[in-house]
Amino acid sequence: MRDVMRYSGIVTKVAAMRAKLLKPQDYDQLASMDTVTDIIEYLKQTKSYGKFITQMDESLYHRGNIEKVLIQSLYDDYTRLYRFADMQQKDFLKIFMKRYEVDLVRYCLRIVFNHSNVPFDLNYKKPFFDKYSKIRIDQLVTAKNIDHLVDYLKNTEYYAPLSRIRQSGASTLADYELALDLYYFSMMWKERKGNWDKKDKEMLTKELGAKIDLLNLQWIYRAKKYYHMLAPDIYTLLIPIQHKLSNQEFKDLVEAPSVEEFKRRLNETYYGKKYEFGEQVQIESIGSECVEHILTIAYRNHPYSLASIQQYLFLKEEEIYKITTALECIRYGLSQRETLQYLVQKQRRQGGNAS
């Protein structure tokens, strides 16, 4: 009863927002469209994106600008949830916000390291970050090099890990992105132990643990298949956290003498038994499927909990990814059938409890 009282307001809000998510028939329509303008006009009729698209000049109807609209809709949803949240729910949303911050910093790192002639295109994010983050976009967009960028993060939690990398003499984009990822996931792994209810801690542990495990597996696989890296070098790439992988399994995977042996050992782990990796090891796509399953089960079992918030934001992000994918399919001239293969949610290969 206490949870029902605490979450009744925000759960009602989430239910109203969930009703605005695109339905399977919407994806059928998107897949049938021939131009980016067709998709924009279709989204213009939706409640989630219409109010942002109507503010656009039709001369700006192209892929880059519509992707900004999608992100603005996500930020708008976050803002609505924050307004309805109590103090503990706000604390969770503040922690959730860090994923948007990390994405922003990663984008800026890539612009700086690639010496891109394309200027920082972040003005559409500025109002949101000014309100919910210590990161100052108006400073970041003036960064000319990595020293400027790191210094502009001085009043944020990201300064320390990136400053340490700078002082170490590391000089590649990969070094900085790795430092950012290691900091983020290690910090989030600690945050899951915070002052949350037991069921919320369980959900956060399962969701984050699966992400870390699968990200590590993805990096191990790529390091072996594409870069032929040795075990000591692979260890330096990995997040030093295991959830469903034992220490011995983790060691065996890293030290597998070949890609074929890695696949064999992978299929003996929890994830291999659950998802039955075939010849093509598609760990990245499995990651999204696994997290969605965990959050869906958590929400189904405990609708009056943080799962209601986290699952909705996950579904919103997945929706944006699918719309972006539809735009990409148009760019490459894919047929309706081919596009639908990317957009339509695949049948879950694993049911039951996410444990």
What are these regions (language model features)?
Residues 1-355:
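N-terminal domain-start signal
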